[in-house]
Amino acid sequence: MSQGLPHEWRTAETRDLFAAILSLRTQEEAERFFRDLCTLPEIEALTHRWQAAQLLDQGLPYHEVAARTGASTTTVTRVAQWLKRGADGYRLVLDRQKRTSGRTA
């Protein structure tokens, strides 16, 4: 665990961050906010995780997901674990995107 985050990650500070994210209205606003908030490697890491979640949801094997995304197999495995036993955040967004694009969940 990161030394900077307490065991209970839902703090007033993290809630404030999520409220700020929810105030964004467009993709351009999100891009601008995250570019200021994160380093390029942090954005790349988040992107790899999200791509991995999408590809794992399509049933691709771990090694292929790693090859396509540039994420390590450790990261792909971690994403797969969170897809199965996480807070259902990945599942929430994956299913929502499927519904809005007309695909079935």
Features from the language model and the residues they span:
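Hydrophobic/basic alpha-helical segments enriched in Actinobacteria
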Residues: F18, E42, L60-Y62, Q97
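Short, Lys/Arg-enriched anionic-surface-contact patches
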Residues: E29-R49
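N-terminal helix-turn-helix DNA-binding core of bacterial DNA-binding proteins
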Residues: L40-I43, Q54, V65
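Short alpha-helical "recognition helix" segments of helix-turn-helix
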Residues: E64-T69, V76
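General nucleic-acid-binding
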Residues: M1-L24
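Short, amphipathic alpha-helical "recognition" segments used to contact nucleic acids or chromatin
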Residues: L46-L60
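Short, solvent-exposed alpha-helical "recognition" segments
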Residues: A80-L94
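Intrinsically disordered, low-complexity basic tails/linkers immediately adjacent to helix-turn-helix/homeobox/MYB/SANT
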Residues: V93-A105
